């Protein structure tokens, strides 16, 4: 996982590893794999569902720790004795791709404690209405395969086959244009 390129010193000291993968207005995403590997030496032997359950346990513990710290934050930083700040674990994601702010894809395996198998894509170019549908469907399928752990050779083969298909004389050129 590639982490944020530059991190303020007060979040992560220089030389320390920053496990924060993505942050926006109301969300924080962290690479929990190093912590899971540290806590569970048999991590590689666990099946995916067991890994998700262990991750959820850790996320819920940190959720409570952070929520408890919000009382101190409210009192000391905002001079507010009573507050409604709360940290909430919304979902467990097995893998994700973060391109930039509000442009990402994530494979959600648990949402608010309920088992899911959901691909959540936000803001990526191929999802836009003016993007040729033939490319949108292809990019969506490649992204899903990448997030679900397909081997590089499998993805490379699909890319080459798609290129061959797009370059063939049998393809109607109008499907390559923008729909608007």
In which residue ranges do the predicted regions lie?
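Catalytic core of nucleotidyl cyclases, primarily class III adenylyl/guanylyl cyclases
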Residues: 29
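DNA-dependent DNA polymerase catalytic subunits
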Residues: 1-23, 32-180
């Amino acid at each position: 996982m590639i982490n944020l390129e530059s991190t303020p010193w007060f979040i992560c000291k220089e030389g320390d590893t920053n496990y924060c993968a993505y942050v926006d207005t109301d969300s924080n995403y962290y690479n929990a794999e190093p912590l899971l590997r540290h806590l569970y030496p048999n991590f590689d032997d666990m099946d995916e569902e067991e890994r998700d359950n262990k991750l959820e346990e850790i996320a819920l513990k940190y959720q409570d720790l952070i929520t408890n710290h919000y009382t101190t934050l409210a009192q000391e930083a905002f001079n507010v004795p009573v507050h409604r700040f709360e940290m909430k674990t919304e979902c467990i994601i097995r893998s994700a791709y973060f391109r930039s702010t509000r442009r990402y894809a994530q494979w959600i395996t648990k949402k608010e404690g309920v088992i899911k198998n959901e691909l959540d894509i936000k803001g990526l170019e191929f999802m836009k209405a003016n993007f040729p549908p033939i490319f949108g469907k292809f990019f969506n399928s490649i992204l899903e395969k990448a997030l679900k752990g397909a081997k590089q050779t499998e993805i490379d083969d699909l890319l080459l086959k798609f290129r061959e298909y797009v370059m063939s004389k049998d393809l109607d050129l109008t499907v390559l244009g923008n729909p608007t």
